[in-house]
């Protein structure tokens, strides 16, 4: 997936306009138009006027800061928490999976990248120092694909380096893309897992628009293993349709 074919406008929060990461992202997306804003609501007001606000939200990029990054993975009321934690560096996703809850949850949320990485470093240090568990599991695939914007943001590469020397913590980066080239230029990390959501070719083609094919995902996982990364696979969702048993088998 080529992000510069998806993103047609860049909005920048004035508070971060001088951020080096903002400058790098804008440079990678030239000549995409750039507009400074003071509040997310300014962008949302424009999205409301679009014929298809959900589709339009996937074509605009918002570079901003985030007040807090680390949160417990949400679960249903009354359910026992799984102990998984999330890091929300990116919000929303350029992929167009028909069944994805983000389609409704982020109906007026532009593709959002938090650029205040130093704040995440500080928050993570304090979080790990205060957490008492043998192995802490944390990932970035809850509110957006972990690698869909990697070519322009470099956030996954940043996280791998950030977690490289952290003991007792396992970072998972989950994706439906094949965007791992930038991750293969540096040494792998023992505590980082690259994970792929898999489905049948029929579901990928019809319901997971913009994502990598099944073959591309599996080949990317092979490349990751060859480089020394641990990998994982998620079969989620499994969809019932005529012939599903054979195709999933």
What are these regions (language model features)?
Residues 1-83:
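Flexible, acidic/Gly-rich N-terminal and inter-domain linker regions that tether
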Residues 17-22, 118-124, 154-158, 211-220, ...:
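Well-ordered, non-membrane alpha-helical segments in soluble/globular domains
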Residues 24, 99, 162-165, 223:
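Alpha-helical scaffold elements within enzyme catalytic domains, especially in hydrolases
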Residues 62-79, 83, 101-195:
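Conserved Radical SAM active-site core
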Residues 143-147, 178-181, 192-212, 237-242:
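Conserved radical SAM core fold
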Residues 217-249:
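Conserved C-terminal portion of the radical SAM core fold
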